[in-house]
Structures are given as structure tokens and as C-alpha cells.
């Protein structure tokens, strides 16, 4: 582009500025400056150091039309506009369209170059967008105040630029074409015309400069999974024909809006969809997860159980927890090592959540509190024992009337860690019959000078019960009495299976450890020392 003339005073100032700032300029000053006739008129090309001057309309002075044809601008505008640009105003199609169809400059610039550019209101003011490293002082001849005084004396205005171009009557070298007009008489809702969300899918692509009337691709929103392209507005007149869905090669599904989660707080406004400003986001209420079902294996995996593999067939026929517990009590006599659960909540959990849907492979035994009989006087001990024998006498039942005889009792299997004996001796009397623990950690029996040393307190109390004939557990077959329940249970095996362990002296024993102790005493021919000799 060419700018205009300067006064002689401005020319002198520019000559001094050129000598000082010549290393920063890449122009050929011999070509940029040409003298035409009078020394008061000089034409020059637009370059960066005149940023402060050309930004004002009164500082723009058009040159004569005869000199426009012979002028060529040497400045490279690609670094400013980012697009190829023809300095000749006549060859710019965007300005042709703006003059022919009366479109604003913003539409022509956005379609011809880039939507992000901010188009100038006049073709001459684009030079003011060039930023250089030049710095101007207020005392310079080209400052704002001096340039206003210099150009105001001449009296030219920037509006004369277009009038002089029109008077030139130059022939345009580009082809002419018709631009379709949009008829909006039959459109019920004219807002659809300015809304880019409604775009007909059958509008063909135009070729040539006619594409300037359509929005560029950068103005349209990018498609993603949250956006669906709606159909054409209902009242729009058929400019290019209605969209033909039959010609498509795939099935088009009905568009449905997306509803992302609204994360805004109640104090703030609701979130707006980043895709379309018309789509409101819907807040989704969170749903509580379902409660996990009761699992039999995981809930009772931490409990130790007594397994009865011989009675699996009988347990498989049960249908309720009550029948299962009663059936287990009948076979409790064969349980050597039971389970004692001291927590009372496990018993409630067993009856409420235990699902009896599969054959039972294990049983859970809980502890029942046993009565403790106390006496106030020593004389009442004998009658109390007789009454207690009647109440705790076990019942002998035959199972399937087949030998050997199985005997069941009301007492369930216990571990040795818990008390399985019934003591009818007052605690004060019991405490006076032993002392300890001693230095070695053992207790000493004080009954009639027994002085037996026992390691555990539980065992020394059971030992004192034998001195006082406090044997609450009785055998119905041989009338033998025992202090502890497991001693009676071990005694009953003699009646069922006999004494399986026999010494060489023909003495029989119920347990193997009893036989080994008998042999270690060396009181018979089966002694350990006698075998070695």
C-alpha cells in the first residue's frame, strides 16, 4: 500500500531519522523515496517507524491517482497477517465483495483470511498493527504532536482515498458471479438463521469467493461425544433443497441430548454445556450401592468348627436351625474337642443370618451356663450332693439298637480352657485348703497334710474336690463318680469299647498314655527297663 505526502519539514525530520536508525530498517531507501516535481511532495512506502503517525485519520494524506499505478510496496506483511496478501487493493477479492454486496469488512476479512484476525476499519490502518523495536521520543519530529501540526496545515482527509480510486475507473480483472439471497418471509423463527447450531446437512460446498458469505470452519464448534447436530429448523425455506436422508449410506439415529453431571455448588449458577449454550446440564442424584448378601463361607470363616463327617447324611435332611441344633446334641458324645464361643452375639447371628440351603459339613457349639451349687454350712454338704446327683444324672439311650452303645448327655463338648466341673464347696472353704502360687509357680494342697504340688489352680481345686468326695458326675453303669465332665466321658468309653490298650502283664488301659506311664514304673514284666535287660 502507499500512504501519502509529507511536508518539507517532515521530510527533513525523516532524513535525520533515517541516518540514525538505518541499521534497524531493511528497506531500500533509494527505491522507497522518489521525488515528483515540487520538493514539497514526496511519496514513500509504509513501514514500521511510522506507527504513531498513521494511527490518526488526519495524518493520512492520499497521493495522486497517477502515481498509484507506478508504486510498488517493498514491505513484507506476512509476519503481520499470517496469510499471503496482495498489496494492490484492486486485486483483493474481499474488498471487492464488500463494495459489491455491501458486506461489512469484518465478514470479508473473516472469510478471506482468518476468523481470529481483527479486521481494520480502513485499509490504511493495518499498518498501525506492525510492532517494531523502534522507540520514539517526545522531542522527535515524528511524534504525535508534531505530526498533527504538519498534516493539519495541508488539510487532507483519509476519506478522499476512496473518491480518488473511484475516479480512476479501473477495469476489474476477476470474474463476476451471483450470490444467493436468503428468503426469510416464510421462516417462522428468524433466530435460526443466525444460530450456527442449525445447519442443513444438504447445503453444497460453494467454490470461489462465494464461500465468504458462509461461516468458516473455525467458527463452527468441534464435534465430540457430548454434541449432536440437530436437524434443520422447521420454518426455513428450501434454499438448496430439503435434506435427503435416503441418499445417505448409513442409518441416522434420532439425536438425543447429553447430560453430564453438574458439579456446581448450590450458591453458584448451574453449569452450562461447553458445547452448546442452549444445553443445560442436569444434576444426577447418586444412588446408594446394594447391600451385599450374606455369605456363609466368608462370615464364619474365622470360627473353628467341629466336623462330623459321619453324620452328614442326617444333617442334610434338616430344614431349620432349631432342628439342626437338636440333632447335633444327640451326637455330641463323639466330639472330643469342641468349640467354646464366649461371645453371646454369635449365637444371635447364627439364628438370624445362617442360611440352611446346603448340606451341613460343620457345626458350631456354644456354651451354656451351668448351675453352681453353694452351701453355707458343712453339715448340709451330704444332702446337697444327693439332690445334685438326681438332677444331673445322664440318660442312657441306644442309637439304632446296634452295638456298641452310644450314650448322649445334656452337656456339650467343652475345651479344657473353660470350666467343665461343678463345685459345690463354698469359695471360702476352697481357698483355705490350698496355698500358692509358690516361688516355682505351683500350688500346694493343705488338706490333712497332703502337700501335693500342682501347677494349675484349676487342677488343685479339682484335687481338693476328690478329698471332700465332691464328685457330681456319676456313671449309671458302675456308679463311679468324677469331678470333671470329660473324666466321666472318658470313663464311658470303657463301657462302649472296653480297654483297647493291654500291657504284657495283661492289664488293660483305656488310653495309650496311661499304658506308657504303667510301663515306665517298671512294676510288671512289661516295664521299659525290664525289656532292655
Swiss-Prot record:
Zinc finger (C2H2-type): 443-472, 473-500, 501-524
PROSITE patterns tied to this protein: ZINC_FINGER_C2H2_1, ZINC_FINGER_C2H2_2
GO cellular component entries: nucleus
Keywords, in A-Z order: Activator, DNA-binding, Metal-binding, Nucleus, Repeat, Transcription, Transcription regulation, Zinc, Zinc-finger
Pfam family, one: zf-C2H2_6
InterPro entries given in the database record: GLI_C2H2-zinc-finger (IPR050329), Znf_C2H2_sf (IPR036236), Znf_C2H2_type (IPR013087)
UniProt-listed Gene3D superfamilies: Classic Zinc Finger (3.30.160.60)
This protein's record includes keyword Chloroplast: no
One Gene Ontology biological process: regulation of transcription by RNA polymerase II
SUPFAM superfamilies, per the entry: beta-beta-alpha zinc fingers
Entry superkingdom: Eukaryota
Cell compartment(s), UniProt: Nucleus
MF terms in GO: DNA-binding transcription activator activity, RNA polymerase II-specific; DNA-binding transcription factor activity, RNA polymerase II-specific; RNA polymerase II cis-regulatory region sequence-specific DNA binding; zinc ion binding
PANTHER family per the UniProt record, alphabetical: METALLOTHIONEIN EXPRESSION ACTIVATOR-RELATED, ZINC FINGER PROTEIN ZIC AND GLI
Function: Regulates the transcription of genes required for cell separation.
Protein name: Metallothionein expression activator
UniProt organism field: Schizosaccharomyces pombe (strain 972 / ATCC 24843) (Fission yeast)
Gene for this chain: ace2
